[in-house]
Every structure is written in C-alpha cells, then in structure tokens.
Swiss-Prot record:
Keywords: Carbohydrate metabolism, Chitin degradation, Chitin-binding, Disulfide bond, Glycosidase, Hydrolase, Hydroxylation, Hypersensitive response, Pathogenesis-related protein, Plant defense, Polysaccharide degradation, Signal, Vacuole. Induction: By ethylene. Residues 1-23 form the signal peptide. This is Endochitinase B. Belongs to the glycosyl hydrolase 19 family. Chitinase class I subfamily. It comes from Nicotiana tabacum (Common tobacco). Its EC number is 3.2.1.14. Defense against chitin-containing fungal pathogens. The modification 4-hydroxyproline is found at P67, P69.
Length: 324
C-alpha cells in the first residue's frame, strides 16, 4: 500500500514539474513578458538564441536587428536631443499638462530596455521607426489645433493624462485584477488604458502597474516604457508596430484581402483600427499622418507607402480601446 502511495505521489510531482516547465515564457503567450540575458522570444513564446527562436518567421520579439549602419547602432545616432526638441517643439508650453515631464533622457533610458527599438534594419528603417513611434504617440497626446503656432503637428506630447472625466477602465479579470480604488484610464505617450493592459505592461517592465497605475504619469522613464512596450509587443492576430515599420511583418492572404499592406497605415490599424480604419477619410488618421510626415522630414527620410488605413478592414479593437 505504501509503495503504491509513494509511486502515485512521485507521478503527481513529476506531472506538476512537467506542467510548470511547459508554461510559455515570453511574448503574447506570457502577457508580454520578455526573455532575460538577451535571448529571443520565439513565435511560440519560448526563450532561446538559435534560429528556431531568433530566425526570420520564428521570432516574435527581442529579435536580432539588421546590419548596423555607419555611425553606430545606438539610438542617439538617429535622434539627437536637438531633434527631439524640434519634433516636440511645444511640449513644454505653459498650456500643456505634460510641461517638463517628457524628456530626451527619459526616452533614451526607457529605450535601453527595448534594444531592438530604433536599432533594427538599415538607416531608413530606423528613422522611419522613430518617426512613426513619435507620430502615433504625438497624436495620442496632441495639444495642437489647425491654426496653432508652428502648425498643429508641433504640439505632440502636450497631455499626460486622459482628458475629461474618465472612468476606472476596470474589466473583471482573474489574471489582471483591478486594485481597490485604482483607475486605469489613459496615461503617458500611448495613453495606455484598462487593467488588462496595465497588468501585462507592468509585468514586462518589472513594475506593479495594477497597484500603481499612476507611475505612468509620474515617472517619465516608466511612462516611455509603457509606450515602447505597446509598440514592441505583438497581440495576435496583430503584429507589433515595430515589426511592421522595419519591414519584418509580411501580410497574410487574409491581410491582403483586407487591404492591410506594409506601411504606417497598418500601425494606425493596430492601435485604433476599430474606430478609425475602413471609414474612408478620417480626421484622426490624417492627424497621425501629418505628424509622421513632419517627423520624417526632420529625420531626413521618406515616409514610404500605404500611410492611410481608410480602405483597410480593422484587425478589431486596439489595445487602447478609447483613444483620441
């Protein structure tokens, strides 16, 4: 009897160990978690450093970049402090809620946690990624208007917290439970919202954002990290914004049938396609494009093709369900 009990117990322990060892480690399968020690995250959610993890078509995040352009692979060789100030010219205007918050140093420090950002591909791809990232986040935080000084596209990063009277944005969840008294309205460059986004974002960057969501609006580095996390993280069936802009994403037959072709327009679709795409001309989409064209001009790169999403079918609701 005791032998049978011991055998059964051993079998149970082995099964539990096997189950724990089989849990996915990273990416969309693990709530946006990242691999340690510079490992790649495979499309199946596992960490490793071989072609099965890092190769084209096998890697979903933390993938190796393309050739490093002359001048160094670091982000500062693409966007300098003076360029940052030129792009976000009025972010420190007295009328802006975010005055003094968004800094170049905070951006660079945050980007170090996402080594593929702005460092993947050739110089054109890298510049377009910087332009696209700041265009989309500038739209989310814009304080500009049609007749604003220096034009409407010089007023990105004006706002820090969602305007109006936002609710708590709490959706019941066993995995990402809302903390008592906390609200998960839009904050930071990408205006991240909802507990089911704050939770995995915090887990990925190593901060408890479910209990401390306002860190996104009080710590500039965490604020930029929240936007970069969204940018770099795919959420099936959507690719990551990063993979689209550097040319890694290749549309499926279903994507092509939906007119989702590589370019800036697909990124808008990823972010807020449920509300903005497939509707013909949309002022919000045009605002995003306006920022993108301006930033491409400052960085000295062409914007590429397929900037609009007016004729694209939506992927569905974006991670950011309510955006400007």
């Amino acid at each position: 009897m005791r032998l049978r009990e011991f055998t059964a117990l051993s079998s149970l322990l082995f099964s539990l160990l096997l189950l724990s060892a089989s849990a996915e480690q990273c990416g969309s399968q693990a709530g946006g978690a990242r691999c340690a020690s510079g490992l790649c995250c495979s499309k199946f959610g596992w960490c490793g450093n071989t072609n099965d993890y890092c190769g084209p078509g096998n890697c979903q995040s933390q993938c190796p970049g393309g050739p490093t352009p002359p001048g160094g692979g670091d982000l500062g060789s693409i966007i300098s402090s003076s360029m940052f100030d030129q792009m976000l010219k009025h972010r420190n205007d007295n009328a802006c809620q975010g005055k003094g918050f968004y800094s170049y140093n905070a951006f660079i420090n945050a980007a170090r946690s996402f080594p593929g950002f702005g460092t993947s591909g050739d110089t054109t791809a890298r510049k377009r990624e910087i332009a696209a990232f700041f265009a989309q986040t500038s739209h989310e935080t814009t304080g500009g208007w049609a007749t604003a000084p220096d034009g409407p596209y010089a007023w990105g990063y004006c706002w820090l917290r969602e305007q109006g009277s936002p609710g708590d944005y709490c959706t019941p969840s066993g995995q990402w439970p809302c903390a008592p008294g906390r609200k998960y309205f839009g904050r930071g460059p990408i205006q991240i919202s909802h507990n089911y986004n704050y939770g995995p974002c915090g887990r990925a960057i190593g901060v408890d954002l479910l209990n401390n969501p306002d860190l996104v609006a009080t710590d500039p580095v965490i604020s930029f990290k929240s936007a970069l996390w969204f940018w770099m993280t795919p959420q099936s069936p959507k690719p990551s914004c990063h993979d689209v802009i550097i040319g890694r994403w290749q549309p499926s037959s279903a994507d092509r049938a939906a007119n989702r072709l590589p370019g800036f327009g697909v990124i808008t679709n990823i972010i807020n396609g449920g509300l903005e795409c497939g509707r013909g001309t949309d002022s919000r989409v045009q605002d995003r494009i306006g920022f993108y064209r301006r930033y491409c001009s400052i960085l000295g790169v062409s914007p590429g093709d397929n900037l609009d999403c007016g004729n694209q079918r939506s992927f569905g609701n974006g991670l950011l369900v309510d955006t400007m």
